[in-house]
Every structure is written in structure tokens, then in C-alpha cells.
Amino acid sequence: MASLRREIVLAASAERVWSALRDFGAVHERLAPGFVTGTTMESEDVRVVTFFNGSSARETRVGCDDKMRRLAYAILGGRAAHYAASAEVRDDEGGCRFVWTIDVLPDALAPYIDDMMSRGAAAMKKTLEAAPGGP
């Protein structure tokens, strides 16, 4: 199993970043616009996200912990035999850290997922640091 991780330092408050992350149906508007171009909610905990390259993924929310500011989700179906992810927002001096981890099988998907994570991380940084309200 390939384990991928991104840690992004953001000049934005942990509260504001957590608010955007936990808004499961608005990832295309609040978290990573441009990278995610659309989100369709199938139920309270299942969404279909469409990405800039036309690919899509059906994701289920596994858990959402407000105290830890941690969201866990998994992809249902698709090319991955296993896809589990989590994102956590931590306080940091002058802003926060966004820690994103994905475990995926088969390992052959890792280069594609790694590239998508890099693009997603860049979109999140741009969006969250530009959001009104300051750090």
C-alpha cells in the first residue's frame, strides 16, 4: 500500500480552514476551486467530486471530528482497491498546518494520486490564504 502525505503551512486561521474542510458539499467552492470543479451530494455523507481534468470520484465521509479538526473519507468504487484519506487542521504560529494523508492500493496509482495531491494542495493554499478575514 502506498501512503502519501502533504503538509501545507497556511497563513490562515485554523478555524477558518477547518470550516472550509468540514463543509463536505462545498469543496469546489470553499476548499479547492479550480482543482475540484463540482460536487454533487448523493446523501449527507456521500459526494461525487469532479476534478479539473474531467475525472470524478465517489467519496464517503467516514468521520468528522470538530475537536481534533479532522475529516476522514474514502473513495467508493473506481480504480483503487483501497483508498482511505484524512485531512487535519492544526494550529501553527501565524496560521495553521493542513495535514493530508492518503493510503491507496494498488501502488501503481501512487504517482497519479501524488500529482493530484500536489495540484490540490496548491489550489487549497491559494484559496485559503486569499479568503477574506485574515489569519
Question: Could you tell me what each predicted segment is?
Answer:
Residues 25-31, 35-78, 84, 92, ...:
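Glycine-rich portal/gate segments that line the openings of hydrophobic small-molecule binding cavities
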Residues 10-12, 51, 75, 104:
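Short beta-strand-to-loop capping motifs
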Residues 19-26, 66, 118, 122, ...:
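Short, intrinsically disordered, mixed-charge
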Residues 75-127, 135:
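Beta-strand/loop substructures that line and gate deep hydrophobic ligand-binding cavities in soluble
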Residues 16-18, 59, 71, 83, ...:
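Short acidic, gly/pro-rich beta-turn/loop elements at beta-sheet edges
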Residues 1-40:
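Hydrophobic ligand-binding cavity/cleft-lining segments
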